[in-house]
Amino acid sequence: MPYQINIANIKINGVTQNGNIDVGPTVHNSHTANSKYFGANFSLGDLSPTSSLLNTGNIDSDVSDQDQIGNPSAPISNQI
């Protein structure tokens, strides 16, 4: 299966569910995240089998982490 995104040595087959791949300085505007998934998938070399670990058991009391309470058209993009 050919890789759809290939940047230097980073190879990505796909991104779903409001996922982001950031290379360099990036500003995101008006994104919402209502679910969290933690996981990793490792492959050493192009032809090696992969192994993955996924944990979805978490407690998050604030439901929405990146909601649109403020003005979504005016992101804060300056560095602190």
From Swiss-Prot:
It holds the Pfam family gerPA. Residues 57-80 are annotated as: Disordered. This is Uncharacterized protein YdgA. It comes from Bacillus subtilis (strain 168). The lineage of its organism: Bacteria, Bacillati, Bacillota, Bacilli, Bacillales.
